[in-house]
Amino acid sequence: MKLTPIMAAVAAALMALSGCSKQTGVGGTASEATATTQAANAQLAKELKLDDPQDFEDAKRGFMARPTGKIMADDGSVLHDFDAYQFVTGQAPDTVNPSLWRQARLNAEIGLFKVTDGIYQLRGFDIANITLIEGKTGWIVVDALTSRESAAAAMAFARQQLGDKPVTALVFTHSHIDHFGGALGIVSPKDVADRQVPVVASNGFMEEATSENVMVGTAMGRRSSYQFGRDLPRSAKGNVDTGLGKNVVYGTFGILTPTKLITQPTEELVLDGVRFVFHNVPGAEAPAEMTFSIPDKKAYGGAENLAQTMHNLLPVRGAKVRDALRWSSYMDQALDQMDGIEVYFGQHNWPVWGHDRISQFIKTHRDVYKYTHDQTVRLINAGLTPREIADTIKLPKSLSEHFGARGYYGALRHNVKAVYQFYLGAYDGNPANLDPLPPQESAKHYLALIGGSDKAVAAAQTAYDKGDYRWAAELLSHAVFGDPANKAAKELLANTYEQMGYAAEAATWRNSYLTAAAELRNGPPTKGISRAGFIEMLM
């Protein structure tokens, strides 16, 4: 295979990032939850109806079989352990936000599920779901997970339970890698060509898959290891969930070129005897995305436009900022597409059954994004900065009481800043921030003003003891950047990040805080993104 200039640049970057780091950590083990953290988690538990059974009934509905064991890489390493999250049961421990713990328990309901007659889902093989729709001669597969290994394991498990039928169509709902990266574990390029298997995607799919996942894939990969807690232990002091599912399987990534693009706003297509009505929804959760209904089965596939969590308008891993107003408008359109629909299923989390419940589910999400947008815009025009707005806006109880709209993957404060960035960019209007010093230089000046890093650590310890973790983290960030040799600063910053992670409702925030703490203690990863992991996507 001859590498194009883009492929060559990516390969070079991957090689550069695969080198070993020589930095070392300060050692130690993860801290316990402080009294302040325990009190914050206990207060939230009192405010929420954590024992509401509806989601648990839905997450278990249609269960057929559960996988066990591990998904292995070609080199013998473990990519995914189906039993790694068995500790997620019962009441929340002190070190996990109780609302997030509830979500983690729900996402721990993994396996093969029957959604309705002729529609099945595989959950827990990766962060996303595979949906199987029974056609006249085989399986219409919706989405392909993140890696070849996880997709192949899911399909093998499905065939064990449902019979060995061929793949007769593959549908990519959108251009994020956790929905197409395992394509070569679903069907081979030769099979697509020889049997003329339709590969269906939305208009602009290949361009967007390339721009988001290849052009900045190296940086995004490093940041995603924070967002998803890739290297954290699966434990009550580590990775308990991602909000959208249990785990991302970092195996071998690939892609298949679509043979059929959905180019119209609404377009009907018959795949292996099943009538689909596709709806393009570009520029919402992904730059290229589509939802669909299957009228004869009274079913609606919402892709990732809707999930059992507030989504993010700008992921922690980085991406193009998403349009909250457009996203909410697509949900209005979805309500108009619900005629006769009795089951909603997405490509993450669990389904919703019943027409009225589905309508309420969609309305709640629509209103969350519209409220976030409108209130942010109002405060922008009142002259507030991104951080000020993020500290001001709260969801009304009429929205926050719905668990499916709480911030397990997205976070309201982060989304508010995304709306600001969407309209005004990263600059907050303060001229001091037009050309600020780099973090290391700024930190050295702050430390000189304070009287040295030891005094900064002492002040941070006082803040930590009071439970003022945000201020402690700010002080200690200066101490670590300005004096990287100060082990006390790193150790206290690790403790601080752990408390912030233990109290975080968003799994993405928890994973980011705890990954940072782990790297302060143990040093950064000894290797970066594998060049081999991307090779099939570059072909």
Task: Describe each PLM feature range.
Residues 29-48, 299, 309, 325-388, ...:
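Divalent-metal (often Zn2+) His-rich catalytic cores of metallo-beta-lactamase-fold enzymes
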Residues 114, 138-140, 146-149, 163, 206-281, 326-338, ...:
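Metallo-beta-lactamase
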Residues 105-165, 289-304:
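Conserved beta-strand hairpin/beta-sheet module of binuclear metal-dependent hydrolase folds
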Residues 16-19:
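C-terminal motif of bacterial Sec signal peptides marking the signal peptidase cleavage site
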Residues 523-539:
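Acidic, aliphatic-rich amphipathic alpha-helical segments
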Residues 137-138, 149-200:
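Active-site metal-binding motif and surrounding structural segment of the metallo-beta-lactamase
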